Amino acid sequence: PVILLSFKDFNGNSFEDSIQSLARILYSAAKDFAFLTENPALNEFDRNDFLKVLHVKGLPFHVQQTVLAEGLKILMQVLRSVYAKEVIVLVDEYDVPLNHARTAGYYNDLFPLLKEMLSGALKDNANLFKGVVTGCLRIAKESVFTDLNNFGSHSVSDTDLAAAVGCTRDE
């Protein structure tokens, strides 16, 4: 199973707006799997957690933050329970929320939430097979990924992955 979490359409001029935007993004990733709520492979606790993720847009602000922090990890647990396979997580444009937050002045509020959301899913998670993260900004030492192990960073000018993504000199 594969989860795509795209931050491409993130927007938010305030921390409160950013929470609403993250809720829409998480919901967009989870709704494709909504049919799994009735799957007998899910236990009651996973089902209830998954329902919170599916209803994240309508939750009170403080509850939304908690669900956002754990939502990706919950979705991975659900997929692992149903499909009995580790999950591939694709995170597209991870840096868009951080760039918005820095520009609008709420970076220090958003950073810990985004770090918990992504690190919780991508570090020490038995449900993860592989994670691929894309973004325009170079990953700095103090980023949402500082806690991750076995992390590689590649730019478009790197040639080591060129054949795998169709960017060889011949092409």
Language model segments and positions:
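Phosphate-binding site recognition
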Residues: 1-171
